[in-house]
């Protein structure tokens, strides 16, 4: 089991915690990470794109000129796809891009993402995030002491109003509960600050 130092909000080591080896020390599966990120990004797509078919395009349905005798090409309606400002044939229509991955794949991708962060030294276990108040200035100071990068993912296992209010206006900082964490979030932030309680929760929930 990998042993990780636990620091306080002043970045001083106060203890250590043993984390599950198959959660925080697993082999990183790049293919699983790719599939998990692709699935999450697909779920974010609005899918509101739309083109107009003949029945939706503005314009008369009257035949512009007689079928024969003019020497011109025959035409039925200005809404024809052949005409400028006419309809679109086989164009995109609103759709839902979301799809599901097997639970086993998602859990495996989460283990890979956590293990990659530990391997690269980008995950830090914090004793707790018990701020004395909800001031953004104090939250920013704590993150600075913890040597957080430009993009930071903060993971806590419990409701923490002071933490939520303190960091919500900080650019590049995201707060999530353990149940909300996705491989996309872990890989999308340079630093991950995780509370000791949340680390233990991951070890219990994701252990094989």
Curated annotation (Swiss-Prot):
GO MF annotations in UniProt: rRNA binding; structural constituent of ribosome
This protein's record includes keyword Transmembrane: no
GO cellular component: ribonucleoprotein complex; ribosome
Alphabetized InterPro entries for the sequence: Ribosomal_uL4, Ribosomal_uL4-like, Ribosomal_uL4_dom_sf
Keywords attached to this entry: Ribonucleoprotein, Ribosomal protein, RNA-binding, rRNA-binding
Top-level taxonomic group: Bacteria
GO biological process: translation
Family, similarity comment: Belongs to the universal ribosomal protein uL4 family.
HAMAP family (UniProt xref): Ribosomal_uL4_B
Summary of subunit composition and partner proteins: Part of the 50S ribosomal subunit.
Primary role: One of the primary rRNA binding proteins, this protein initially binds near the 5'-end of the 23S rRNA. It is important during the early stages of 50S assembly. It makes multiple contacts with different domains of the 23S rRNA in the assembled 50S subunit and ribosome. Forms part of the polypeptide exit tunnel.
Designated name of the protein: Large ribosomal subunit protein uL4
